[in-house]
From Swiss-Prot:
It comes from Buchnera aphidicola subsp. Uroleucon sonchi. It comes from the Bacteria. Mg(2+) 2 binds at residues 150, 322, 326. This is Ketol-acid reductoisomerase (NADP(+)). InterPro entries: 6-PGluconate_DH-like_C_sf, 6PGD_dom2, KARI, KARI_C, KARI_N, KARI_prok, NAD(P)-bd_dom_sf. GO terms for cellular component: cytosol. Binds 2 magnesium ions per subunit. GO terms for molecular function: ketol-acid reductoisomerase activity; metal ion binding; NADP binding.
Length: 345
C-alpha cells in the first residue's frame, strides 16, 4: 500500500532489510508473471477483485490457503492460472525453517477451472521449491482437500486442543498448589519440548521418553480422552465438510470479528497468560516426567484428528500433515508468546 511505503512501517522495513523490491500495487502487479496473495482470508475477496484488474493476461495468481476459492466461491478471470502452495505451519515458521536451510511440508494444488494453459502444477512445484519445501516434502492435493483438512486440524489438535489444554493444565497445577511461575513455564515450553520428539519419531518416540509406568498411565488417560471427545471431533468435521463452520466464520467477519475478538480478549486475561515468569531452567526430561497429562492429550488429539479426517475421505498424507507434522510448529508459537501469538498468526 502507498501509505505503508510512505510511513515506512514494519512490513516495509522487513522487505527492505531482506532485499525485496518494494513498490505499490499499480507499479508492480501489471508486470508480474506470478502474484501471490498472502493476505488474511477475510480480505481475500476485496484484494482478489483489485488484483484481477491489474494483472496482465495469462499471468498466475497464487494462494497459500484455498478458503476464498472453496468456501467463498471466488470467480477468477479465465486467462489467469490459479495455484496454491500451502505450507503446513504459520508464515513465521516458513521463514525460520528456510533460514536454517530446511523447509516445511507443503500441499500444492491447481484450481482446475483456471488452468487453461496446463502450467499450474509446474509453477506450484517451482514456488514450493523456492521456499525449501522440497527438503521436507511436497504433496499434490486439491483446493477442497486443503481447506477441509486445514480447518479440521486447526479447530482440533493444532490450535483448539493446545489452547484449551494449556488453560486446563495450568488450572490443575495451581489447584494442586504448584508454583504459578513454574506451572506456566512447564506448559508454555513443555508443548514445544515434547512435540519436538514427534518430528523425529512420532507418537512412539514421544511415549518412549516416559518410564514404563508413566507410559501406561499416559496411554490410559489418552484412551479416556478419545472416548470423551470423539463425538465433538466428528461434529467439527461434519460442520467443516458441510460448510456450516465457514458460514458462521464469515458471518463474524461481517460483524467486525466481534466473536473472534471477544475470544482473544478472554484468553488475554486468563491467569495462564498473566502468570509470573519462572527464571530457573527446567531440564528437558522434566517436561516429560511432569507432563504426563500433556502427553496423553497430544496422543489423543493427534489420533482423533487423523482418524476423523481419514473417515471423512481425506487422504492419509494430508491428514498426517494436519494432525501430527504441523503440531511442533504451532507449539513453537506458544513457547514464544503463550497463546497470544498462536491466536494472532
Amino acid at each position: 500500500k502507498k501509505n505503508s511505503i510512505a510511513k515506512k512501517n514494519q512490513s516495509w522495513i522487513n522487505a527492505i532489510e531482506n532485499n525485496f523490491k518494494v513498490d505499490d500495487y499499480e507499479s508492480l502487479i501489471p508486470n508480474a508473471d506470478l502474484v501471490i496473495n498472502l493476505t488474511p482470508d477475510k480480505e481475500h475477496h476485496h484484494v482478489v477483485q483489485v488484483l484481477q484488474k491489474l494483472m496482465k493476461k495469462n499471468s498466475c495468481l497464487g494462494y497459500s490457503h484455498g478458503f476464498n476459492i472453496v468456501e467463498f466461491g471466488e470467480i477468477i478471470r479465465k486467462d489467469i492460472t490459479v495455484i496454491m502452495v500451502a505450507p503446513k505451519c504459520p508464515g513465521t515458521e516458513v521463514r525460520e525453517e528456510y533460514k536454517r536451510g530446511f523447509g516445511v511440508p507443503t500441499l500444492i494444488a491447481v484450481h482446475n477451472e483456471n488452468d487453461i494453459r496446463q502450467i499450474g502444477l509446474d509453477i506450484a512445484k517451482a514456488w514450493s521449491f523456492s521456499i525449501g519445501s522440497h527438503r521436507a516434502g511436497v504433496l499434490e492435493s486439491s483446493f477442497i482437500a486443503e481447506v477441509k483438512s486445514d480447518l479440521m486440524g486447526e479447530q482440533t489438535i493444532l490450535c483448539g486442543m493446545l489452547q484449551t489444554a494449556s488453560l486446563l493444565c495450568y488450572e490443575k497445577l495451581i489447584a494442586n498448589k504448584n508454583d504459578p511461575a513454574y506451572a506456566s513455564k512447564l506448559i508454555q515450553n513443555g508443548w514445544e519440548t515434547i512435540t519436538e520428539s514427534l518430528k523425529h519419531g512420532g507418537i512412539t518416540l514421544m511415549m518412549d521418553r516416559l518410564s514404563n509406568a508413566s507410559k501406561i498411565r499416559a496411554y490410559n488417560i489418552s484412551e479416556k480422552i478419545k472416548k470423551i471427545l470423539s463425538s465433538l471431533f466428528q461434529k467439527h468435521m461434519n460442520d467443516i465438510i458441510s460448510g456450516e463452520f465457514s458460514h458462521k466464520m464469515m458471518q463474524d467477519w461481517q460483524n467486525n470479528n466481534k466473536q473472534l475478538l471477544d475470544w482473544r480478549n478472554k484468553n488475554k486475561n486468563t491467569s495462564f497468560e498473566k502468570a509470573p515468569v519462572y527464571h530457573n531452567k527446567i531440564p528437558e526430561q522434566e517436561y516429560y516426567d511432569h507432563g504426563i497429562l500433556m502427553i496423553a492429550i497430544l496422543k489423543a488429539g493427534i489420533e482423533l484428528s487423523f482418524e476423523t479426517m481419514l473417515n471423512s475421505g481425506i487422504i492419509a498424507e494430508s491428514a498426517y500433515y494436519e494432525s501430527l507434522h504441523e503440531l511442533p510448529l504451532i507449539a513453537n508459537t506458544i513457547a514464544r508468546k503463550k497463546l497470544y501469538e498462536m491466536n494472532k498468526v
